[in-house]
Amino acid sequence: MALTFVMPGALREFSGGRGEVRVGGAAHTAGEALALLWAECPGARDRVMNERGEVRTHINIFIDGENIRHGGGLAAPVGDGAEIIILPAVSGGQAPS
């Protein structure tokens, strides 16, 4: 099974500048899929996960458009050929006047 990870700009330094990283291997859950990504792009792990092995609060992970926070967290199911988007939260700016 091949999975496609869509990497945000902030993580591309760990993916050799690639916006998409395709990984092969068996993954039935989000946690297993992320383990495959860490094998390919090990430096990205500390940016996405905290010291307790949880997804950082400012990071959202979507599997085929579904946020894993609402679908089982790291136990969320991953289908064959899934697209997994790692998306840091965006905040700041100024309210319109």
Report each predicted region and the residues it spans.
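Ubiquitin-like/PB1-type beta-grasp interaction modules and other compact soluble beta-rich domains
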Residues: 1-97
